[in-house]
Amino acid sequence: MTNNYSNWTFKGKTVKNIEDMQIHEPKVWGFVYLMSLYDIKTGELKYQYIGKKNIYSKRKRSFGKKEVASMKDKRGKKYEYVIKESDWKTYLSSNSFIKDNANKYKIKREILMFSTNDMDLKYKEAKEIICRGCLEDDFFLNDGASLRVFGKKVM
């Protein structure tokens, strides 16, 4: 597959690393993006997609046998959380149409807004999908919006 996608941009400026994001949001956790698909031959805008991407992944790592054996308190937790940078630089989308047809379109990847936590990120994505009318228009490839919010945990 050839690389038909652009670098990520935010307000017209290229975003190449996390430091470029931290200029706008020092405690950035992820972003909401707009992906625009242009016909390679005509340059005509065909589809758009709103999505979200975490720039870090948080994984649960279980301790090995030696680590567990060296623990003073055997009743303690036998795992730790590891946070590392995600694949955001080369990320195309979770949308199957975009992944399957990426070589047929020139793809522009634009960051719309940054977020500092996962709950805020989910809220901003759902709000953007609903406010832009993505679910009512075939021009957008979005299939749905999902959000569960309890209390004042957002923002």
Where are these regions (language model features)?
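Structure-specific nucleic-acid interaction/processing domains
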Residues: T2-M155
